[in-house]
Amino acid sequence: MVGEVRIDHTDEDVANAIKGFLADENPVDAIFATTNLLTICGLKYINSLGLKIPDQLAVVGFDETDAFDLFYAPVTYVKQPMAELGLKSVRILLDAIEKKGSSIESAIFETELVVRKSSVVTL
């Protein structure tokens, strides 16, 4: 399932998306948020429901933030190679400036899943 969240209504849209995921005939058992803001909004809403992470709902975020360490179940996240992303972006920008034009370029970077308590159910 995919939920749409508008940046100007983040808390409300995240809450509505999670409500829908949980009310579905086949409710989700995990949520993957694509930004730190969405992850944090999701954690706030899940807490307001009294759900226990990860026992009742697992949470995975995208990208690292110290805020994930403050939660009672530190958040699992996808770690991006930020230094490599920055260097590649600068190279593309400098090439565009030197060549007085722009081109579309794609790049693939290795990521790492950092597994923490928010996605690991202990028996």
Regions found by a protein language model. Give the residues of each.
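Bacterial carbohydrate/catabolite-sensing allosteric modules
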Residues: 1-123
